[in-house]
């Protein structure tokens, strides 16, 4: 016994030391990782910025150019043909002893869902602004998405080589339109030939890039006493003053020092990092990606100011040492099959590992790859904080949370609720979904479709292949809706816009070799009830020798909160208390399913609540029969109450020369548009802010080009739904029936 104890002591000690050193190594490894997203309005230069990062990091040997169609991150045929990003892509590269996992995201409003899913995988973002345009419509959208995920940000003001670039206007836009606190770390300067250089606020240096070697090298020279240096010193003092009001460590040094000139650069950078990761400020840098200026300093700022994985996502500590990974993208490779991009939030994923999704689907990881857009390098294991591509996952969908076992998931949910102080043992069946559902990816939020259309294969023999293609595309893109219309017998697609639907058709042809036919695009109208209604439906049938019996009383009322509730009045409560939770769930599911298709144009019924008054279910009645009866009862109620149509409204920003504004506004008035404001935009242009019905905007881009002789530009995005008058409702119904 003594001999055993003497022998086991050193072994246990060695094992403990190994575990400790392993944990220290993992923390050190994680501290050198940066998971970042690149966000921007379309055409701000986001993909060009990404391509320059890859080039200067040594990941690519040649500069990728959007106009040449040879970019790494825009690898789809449609992306290279159109010069826009359609799908998010992940690339990994090293920069100054750090590993950067970068996600290049789409800038077009039709692909907002791609951005949303990508933000679950990153710890910080770089927002690219067009220096000639400032904050634009989609900039505001992606900024609000980053706000939702509480992500620290850097700003890169691109295209500062252009004569019409205005850095001060961009900074002003950040304050006014995004209501943020920008801190400028750089200022632009141009020589006599108009070549862009950068003055660095912290180091008081001028940075000049060498174009002979494609911007690989740059000179940093201390400024000599001059007006430029005095101005830069003032900016440095302002930066120190601003940061000292936000950071105690810097404030203590400022109080004890005689001059701001004595404040060490490293101290400023540490204070700036703390303020950035705490989202108190947003550092602003500048350059020109196309002209190879400023990119290396941008990557330095990513390492210096954006957080490491260990500084984020503490909410996933509830998983302990178990695996927690968020699926943010799925792509289909012809040789490897479906490839799943996962951000590892906790634990370690190894080749051959068994994983389970929060929806209960078991999977086995056959291979692991390091991402480089559409190229892959195989690895055996990946640590927490990193991004990895998993092969072999057949049922996982975008947005899923993966962990090591069902018990690990349940324990994590329990710990999470305990951390919130939520120890309630029972939640009423008609309560809203648990607030942890989004965290654990049980109920991902998917935006409503704006357009829909039918899709037909070229022949009956291609039907199965088309359905398989749509199934794969839907796994990649959750915002693509696929349904079957039992009335017409057609497959129906729902999407976020005309471009979205066009890209889906193009991808089915190029990737699956099926020349599908899309029907005319239809507006995705919604419906809402005109008046409350109450009815009772009793149904009895004999199916396969078994008696099926349901009697149910439901009511529909105007309500924007819960979809389904119980009418707990004294008359109904005794009956409701006899209904088992499972039956209540079946009744809820059947009732809500009927709201997916309204009686007028088949639009989703919104702003409507279903109230269950009472229900009597015969012994042995199948759940499917109960569900169908509930749906039938709601359909009857909708016909009784009547519905009104709600049409989608788009928010437009139109920029045009002042002399073209009157013609544009006259055309907008004919399109039932509501002009919100007309603002000056530079010296010669004006910007019109307007809301208009989507139904009136078919072909509007071409019309705007004609009216303005090609001098106007436009962006638009969904901004809600609005009621219609009876004339427009009748016209919408005729369009839905194919009569217009």
From Swiss-Prot:
Transit peptide segment: 1-29
Parts forming coiled coils: none
Gene Ontology biological-process annotations: mitochondrial translation; ribosome disassembly
One Pfam family this sequence matches: EFG_C
Keyword terms, alphabetized: GTP-binding, Mitochondrion, Nucleotide-binding, Protein biosynthesis, Transit peptide
Locations listed in the record: Mitochondrion
PROSITE patterns associated with the record: G_TR_1, G_TR_2
Domain tr-type G: 31-310
UniProt-recorded name of the protein: Ribosome-releasing factor 2, mitochondrial
Organism: Drosophila melanogaster
Encoding gene (name): mRRF2
């Amino acid at each position: 016994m003594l001999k055993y104890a003497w022998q086991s002591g050193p072994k246990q000690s060695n094992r403990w030391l190994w575990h400790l050193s392993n944990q220290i190594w993992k923390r050190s490894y994680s501290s050198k990782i940066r998971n970042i997203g690149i966000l921007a309005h379309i055409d701000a230069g986001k993909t060009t910025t990404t391509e320059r990062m890859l080039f200067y990091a040594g990941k690519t040997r040649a500069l990728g150019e959007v106009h040449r169609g040879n970019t790494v991150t825009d690898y789809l045929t449609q992306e290279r043909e159109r010069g826009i990003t359609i799908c998010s892509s992940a690339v990994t590269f090293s920069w100054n002893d750090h590993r950067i996992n970068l996600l290049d995201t789409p800038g077009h409003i039709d692909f907002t869902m791609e951005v949303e899913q990508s933000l679950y995988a990153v710890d910080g973002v770089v927002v690219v602004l067009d220096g000639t345009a400032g904050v634009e419509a989609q900039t505001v959208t992606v900024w609000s998405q980053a706000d939702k995920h509480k992500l620290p940000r850097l700003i890169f003001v691109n295209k500062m080589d252009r004569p019409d670039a205005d850095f001060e206007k961009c900074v002003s836009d950040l304050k006014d339109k995004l209501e943020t606190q920008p801190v400028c770390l750089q200022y632009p300067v141009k020589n006599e030939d108009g070549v862009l250089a950068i003055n660095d606020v912290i180091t008081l240096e001028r940075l000049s890039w060498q174009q002979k070697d494609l911007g690989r090298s740059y000179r940093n020279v201390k400024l000599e006493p001059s007006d430029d240096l005095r101005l830069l010193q003032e900016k440095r003092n302002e930066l120190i003053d601003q940061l000292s009001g936000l950071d105690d460590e810097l404030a203590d040094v400022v109080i004890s020092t005689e001059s701001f000139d004595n404040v060490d650069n490293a101290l400023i950078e540490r204070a700036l990092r703390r303020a950035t990761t705490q989202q108190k400020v947003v550092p602003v840098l500048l350059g020109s990606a196309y002209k190879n200026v400023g990119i290396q300093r941008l990557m330095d700022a990513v390492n210096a100011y954006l957080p490491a994985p260990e500084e984020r996502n503490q909410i996933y500590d509830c998983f302990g040492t178990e695996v927690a990974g968020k699926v943010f993208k799925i792509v289909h490779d012809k040789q490897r099959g479906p490839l799943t991009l996962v951000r590892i939030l906790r634990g370690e994923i190894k080749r051959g590992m068994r994983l389970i999704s929060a929806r209960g689907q078991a999977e086995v990881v056959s291979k692991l790859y390091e991402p480089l857009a559409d190229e892959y390098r195989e690895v055996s294991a990946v640590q927490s904080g990193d991004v990895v591509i998993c092969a072999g996952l057949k049922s996982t969908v975008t947005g899923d949370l993966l962990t090591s076992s069902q018990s690990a998931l349940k324990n994590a949910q329990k710990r999470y609720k305990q951390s919130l102080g939520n120890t309630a043992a029972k939640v009423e069946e008609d309560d809203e979904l648990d607030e942890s559902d989004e965290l654990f990816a049980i109920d991902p939020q998917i935006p409503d479709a704006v357009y829909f259309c039918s899709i037909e294969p070229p022949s009956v023999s291609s039907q199965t292949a088309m359905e398989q293609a749509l199934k794969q595309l839907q796994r990649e893109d959750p915002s693509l809706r696929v349904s079957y219309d039992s009335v017409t017998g057609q497959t129906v697609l729902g999407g976020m816009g005309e471009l979205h639907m066009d890209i889906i058709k193009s991808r089915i042809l190029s990737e699956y070799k099926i020349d599908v036919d899309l029907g005319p695009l239809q507006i995705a109208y919604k419906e809402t009830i005109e008046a409350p209604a109450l009815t009772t439906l009793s149904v009895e049938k004999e199916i396969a020798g078994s008696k099926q019996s349901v009697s149910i009383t439901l009511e529909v009322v105007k309500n924007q909160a819960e979809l389904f509730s119980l009418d707990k009045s004294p008359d109904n409560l005794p009956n409701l208390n006899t209904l088992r939770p499972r039956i209540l769930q079946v009744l809820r599911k059947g009732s809500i399913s009927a709201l997916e298709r309204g009686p007028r144009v088949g639009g989703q019924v919104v702003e409507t609540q279903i109230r269950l008054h009472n229900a009597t279910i015969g012994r042995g009645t199948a759940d499917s029969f109960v569900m169908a009866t509930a749906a039938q009862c709601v359909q009857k109620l909708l016909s009784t109450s009547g519905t009104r149509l709600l049409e989608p409204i788009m928010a437009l920003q139109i920029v045009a020369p002042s002399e073209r504004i009157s013609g544009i506004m006259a055309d907008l008035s004919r399109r039932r548009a509501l002009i919100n404001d007309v603002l000056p935009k530079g010296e010669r242009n004006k910007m019109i802010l307007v809301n208009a019905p989507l139904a009136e905007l078919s072909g509007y881009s071409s019309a705007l080009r004609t009216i303005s002789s090609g001098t106007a530009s436009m962006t638009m995005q969904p901004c809600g739904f609005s009621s219609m008058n009876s004339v427009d409702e009748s016209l919408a119904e005729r369009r839905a029936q194919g009569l217009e």
